[in-house]
UniProtKB/Swiss-Prot annotation:
Keywords: Ribonucleoprotein, Ribosomal protein, RNA-binding, rRNA-binding. Residues 1-28 are annotated as: Disordered. This is Small ribosomal subunit protein uS11. GO terms for cellular component: ribonucleoprotein complex; ribosome. GO terms for biological process: translation.
Length: 135
């Protein structure tokens, strides 16, 4: 049996990111009790840039802090600005602590915030909530 030779078929192909020229878009901020995720999309909903607290470098309980939300929103906004984003409409979802901080940091980076909407899903008395924690 001849020795096996290695081939490059398993190598990863790195695709270059193309610059999208989008001036106006949507910023979706999902702020949970454990994490904050910011996705910036074009008006049709295609994601241009995103960031999460874990991706920015926070681990464990530090992901749920307002500072982590601030850094997450800044990272996503900078990536979106590379694609020409200047103005966003903000959609906030979830009960987390980083909601307002993320919006403020979007403005601080230089994105103009057009409107802010709360799109947190509210049940019409659907599932029973989890029991209260006793610590």
């Amino acid at each position: 049996m001849p020795p096996k030779t290695r081939s490059q078929t398993g190598a990863k192909k790195v695709r270059r990111k193309e610059k999208k020229n989008v001036a106006h878009g949507h910023a979706h901020i999902k702020s949970t009790f454990n994490n904050t995720i910011v996705s910036i999309t074009d008006p049709s909903g295609a994601v241009i840039a995103w960031a999460s607290a874990g991706q920015v470098g926070f681990k464990g309980s530090r992901k749920s802090t307002p500072f982590a939300a601030q850094m997450t929103a800044e990272a996503a906004a900078r990536r979106a600005q590379e694609h020409g984003m200047r103005k966003v409409d903000v959609f906030v979802k979830g009960p987390g602590s980083g909601r307002e901080t993320a919006i403020r940091s979007l403005q601080a980076v230089g994105l103009e915030v057009g409107s802010i909407q709360d799109v947190t899903p509210v049940p019409h008395n659907g599932c029973r909530p989890p029991k209260r924690r006793r610590v």
